[in-house]
Each structure stands twice: as structure tokens, then as C-alpha cells.
Amino acid sequence: MTNKTWGGRFKKSLDSGVNQFNASLSFDHVLFDQDINGSQVHVKQLAKQKILTEAECQGIYSALEEIRTEIKQGQYSFNERDEEDIHMFIEQLLIQKIGDLGKKLHTGRSRNDQVALDLRLYTRDKGCLINELLTRLIVCLDDLTSKHQQDLMPGYTHLQQAQPVALGAYFNAYQCMFSRDKSRLEDWFKRMNYSPLGAGALAGSTLPLDREWVAESLGFAGIIPNTLDAVSDRDFVIELCSVAAMIMMHLSRLCEDLILWSTQEFNFVTLDDAFATGSSLMPNKKNPDVPELIRGKSGRVYGHLMAILTVMKGLPLAYNKDMQEDKEGLFDTINTIIVCLQMITPFLQSLTFNTPLMRTKAQSGYLDATAILESLVMKGMPFRDAHHQVGAWIAEAIEKQCSLNELLKGG
């Protein structure tokens, strides 16, 4: 028999290479807070259902709280432990603290429903933080929209000057995009916020568990009724990663514009020294590292989304060890989007916009062509004829090196 918690039917010790290959403690230790929260409510339920005594419940509950404090204080090195994962790590610490009583913690529970619970609690906590950071960004963009309502700039299609727009309208466009992202995140929360605990490995438990009480105690809207579904799907992880990818796409596009605008060729925006870096060789350089890194990290988030989708696509019901591979991508996605949202708002607030130059550019380059076309339409000219006529005038103005207004007034 091995010394593993599940080792009763095994005659050989686990190969050291397999033990290392199988372990996830080095990265899933970030779930310790959620794991302890879930375990504390679980033992309260066991006492409520008379499976544990109140004294046993209190002993386990208090020891778990001590373990939480010790982990937060950095008393343990997760890279030097033999336990497979954070769940077994905490259970072993519990047994070391309170002896055989600690062995009762896992009564009526599998790691399958335990990890599913931890992930839902973790993504819920982080989702709330992402939502808060999105709200700050939306407020920042709203402020910029109001501040620059009257500041004209060239609008672009195909990165070519198209029509004049307000700089405020530009920021409002991104405000709308991030507002939809916020709505998507809140929709995800409604689907995710259900408890899997009590589903066991896949078929529940013969013990008289009160799943609804546990769900309510942990702040869930209810339980996942089908136990197979509760432990076997990671659609809530995939959906959060998908929302994160959408947010990163919008951040990347915003950053791309600001990178272009900060070049000498555009000169629409000046980077604050506190949010720019220099060159190790060229003393003249002022580099937009913040938006470049955000733009680059978007690809990283996309990659994690595709990886998790690919992991899940061929798995039979219910739980499979492949699903351990959801965590590193999820954790990195969450950490990446949080740091990007934390950086983008103060970065935007630090920028200085060259609004006089933007206005000058908006009033040159034949950006008034569409307005002139539509004025001809209002006078009764067919649209296609008006389009052809204004195009001919533009060609003539380019040849004469004058504006459309100058050409038309001269005519």
C-alpha cells in the first residue's frame, strides 16, 4: 500500500517521475483560499446533517482557518511538497494538526466536485475584480468622451483619412465596446454561479447531504442538478476565457491606435514619461511599452482559450485527468487581463493629446468630400452621379494642389 490518500488498493509506491508528472500543487496552490472556504462550509453541512458532531466540526473548521493564516504568511513552500495538489496538501496539513479527526474532512466529497467548486469560487472572485476594473476603464473613457466632444480629428478606414470625427466620439466607441464586454461578463456570472458540491465523483453520495444549504452558504444561486454535468464540464472556464479574449481584443485595438498616434509621423499624442521607456542605445527614443505589451499579451490570452477548448473537445463523461490542464491557462488568462486593465486606465489618463494638430488634419486631406457629395444629393442629384462628380473634383484639386472648398469657390 502506498502512502497516498487513495493508495489502499495499490501494492507499489508511485513512480517518482509519475508523481512529479501528475502533480499540480506548483500552480493550483492559488486556489487555497477557495478550497478552505469550501471545506469549512462542507464540514458545517456534515455537522448540520449529524454526520459529524458539533465539536468535530469546530475542530476541523478552526484548524482550516489556522492553515489559511499560515499559507498567507508564507510558511509553506509549494515546490518542496509531495502532495499532488492543493486539496491533498491542505488535507495533509489538517491531519498533521488534529490527527484522525482531519481524516473526516473528505466525508461525502470527491476531489472532482471539490475542484469544480474551487474553480467556480475562484473565477467568481476574479470575475468580480475584472468587472470592477472594467468599470473604472469605462468611467475613464466616459470622462475622455466628455472632455473631447468638440475636438475634431481625422477618422480612418483602411488606415486612410476618411471623414472628420470628434476625438470624444473615438473614445465613446471604445466605451461602448467595453460596456458590452462588461455585459458579457455579467451574463457569464449568471450561468457560472451554481454549486457543484455534493456531486461526488460523478454520481453524488449515499450520505444525507444538503446541497442546497451548501450552495446558499457559499453565495451561489443554486445547485447544478445533474451530478455528471457538475463535475465534467468546464464551459464556465471556457466562457470566462472567451470574454477575456474579447476584452483583450478591444484593448489591443485601442493600444494599436495609441501606438500609431504616438509616432512622429502622427504626433497626435504625447506619452507621459512615467508610462514610457527609453532605448539602451538610442538616447532619442521614447517607447510606448505599456500599449505594446497589452497588444502582445492579447495573443497569449487567445492561445489559452484555444488550448482549453482543445483539451475539452474529445473527453468522455465524466471527469478525466486531462481537465487538470485547464488551470494554468485559466490562471494566466486571469492574471494577464487583470494587470492589463490595471495599467490601461492610468495610462489613458496620463496622455496629452495634440488637439490643434488633430483639428488641422481633420480640415485637410479632402475629408469633407462625403459631406459635399451628400449636399449634392439633397439638391436632387442621383447618389452615383454625385459620387462620380465629387471624385472628379478631388482629382482636379489634387492636380491643382488645393482644397475642395478652394476649388469650388474658384469655380
Swiss-Prot record:
The keyword Cytoplasm applies. Keywords: Amino-acid biosynthesis, Arginine biosynthesis, Cytoplasm, Lyase. One of its GO terms (cellular component) is cytosol. The keyword Cytoplasm applies. InterPro entries: Arg_succ_lyase_C, Argininosuccinate_lyase, Fumarase/histidase_N, Fumarate_lyase_CS, Fumarate_lyase_fam, Fumarate_lyase_N, L-Aspartase-like. Its EC number is 4.3.2.1. It catalyses: 2-(N(omega)-L-arginino)succinate = fumarate + L-arginine. GO terms for molecular function: argininosuccinate lyase activity. One of its GO terms (biological process) is arginine biosynthetic process via ornithine. It is found in: Cytoplasm. Pfam families: ASL_C2 (PF14698), Lyase_1 (PF00206). Pathway: Amino-acid biosynthesis; L-arginine biosynthesis; L-arginine from L-ornithine and carbamoyl phosphate: step 3/3. PANTHER family: ARGININOSUCCINATE LYASE. Belongs to the lyase 1 family. Argininosuccinate lyase subfamily. This is Argininosuccinate lyase. It comes from Legionella pneumophila (strain Lens). The lineage of its organism: Bacteria, Pseudomonadati, Pseudomonadota, Gammaproteobacteria, Legionellales.
